[in-house]
């Protein structure tokens, strides 16, 4: 998965806004549904399911309870327009898929995960993974080719207001986006926390009356927030220092663009 922030910017949605969370929720619900249907089709064709399928919640049907109670009701007109012409499964569709999987099985035990996609996103001219961009124009130091500069994908006067740096966004909003996807993903996601060493004034209410310096307490509060919301993993914590350095970035020596 990559390009989510680019999708938001090109459709003039702010990262972490209610409509961006709604889009993420529905998009990954669709991804879940259609990968389940594809895995069920393969299981039928090959007459084989993953090991211990009969002991899984897919077989008992418990897995589908969250999808079979109500139909999707769009809250945002913009999100509704984005999905116009795309088949959004109804609760009846989910019930039919639930029955088909109970009868014929699933070929894949694991289907979905979100990788960091740091380098590959540049090649594809889109934003990395599900997280926000870090700069409007990003500088990368490649060991073999020297410095390379990458503007935010589809950067224009229209998209610029929606390309806010990850370091200037409340990390709870980033977690909200990831959790909206996590509901539909059976494995973990490369959820990265982007923190300034000097936190923006007023961003986190628990800092009121305290130093704005980032501390381990701040990280613990955010980790607990992510856990309570249902995130399965946190990948990295990247820190932007007062010297304009990034610490903790996933710099792979063997990866070049």
Predicted regions and their residues:
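Core structural elements
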Residues: 1-12, 184
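Glycine-centered flexibility motif
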Residues: 3, 47-49, 69, 129, ...
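Catalytic phosphate/nucleotide-handling subdomain of diverse soluble enzymes
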Residues: 7-11, 15-38, 125-150
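Internal maturation/activation junctions in enzymes
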Residues: 13-117, 189-190
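Catalytic alpha/beta core of large soluble enzyme barrels
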Residues: 64, 80-92, 99-246, 251-257
């Amino acid at each position: 998965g990559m390009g989510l922030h680019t999708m938001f910017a090109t459709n003039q949605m702010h990262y972490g806004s209610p409509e961006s969370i709604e889009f993420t929720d529905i998009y990954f619900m669709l991804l879940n549904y259609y990968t389940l249907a594809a895995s069920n089709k393969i299981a039928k064709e090959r007459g084989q399911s993953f090991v211990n399928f009969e002991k899984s919640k897919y077989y008992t049907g418990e897995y589908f309870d969250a999808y079979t109670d109500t139909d999707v009701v769009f809250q945002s007109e913009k999100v509704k327009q984005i999905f116009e012409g795309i088949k959004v499964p109804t609760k009846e569709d989910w019930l039919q898929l639930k029955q088909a999987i109970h009868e014929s099985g699933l070929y894949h035990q694991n289907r979905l995960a979100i990788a960091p996609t740091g380098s590959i996103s540049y090649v594809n001219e889109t934003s990395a993974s599900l997280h926000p961009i870090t700069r409007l124009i990003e500088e990368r130091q490649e060991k073999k080719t020297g410095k390379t500069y990458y503007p935010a994908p589809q950067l224009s006067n229209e998209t610029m207001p929606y390309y806010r740096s990850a370091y200037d966004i409340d990390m709870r909003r980033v977690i909200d986006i990831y959790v909206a996807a996590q509901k539909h993903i059976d494995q973990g996601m490369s959820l990265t926390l982007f923190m300034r060493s000097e936190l923006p004034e007023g961003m986190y209410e628990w800092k009121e009356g305290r130093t704005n310096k980032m501390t381990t307490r701040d990280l613990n509060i955010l980790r607990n927030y992510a856990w309570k919301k249902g995130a399965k993993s946190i990948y990295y914590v990247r820190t932007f220092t007062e010297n304009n350095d990034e610490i903790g970035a996933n710099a792979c020596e063997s990866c070049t663009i």
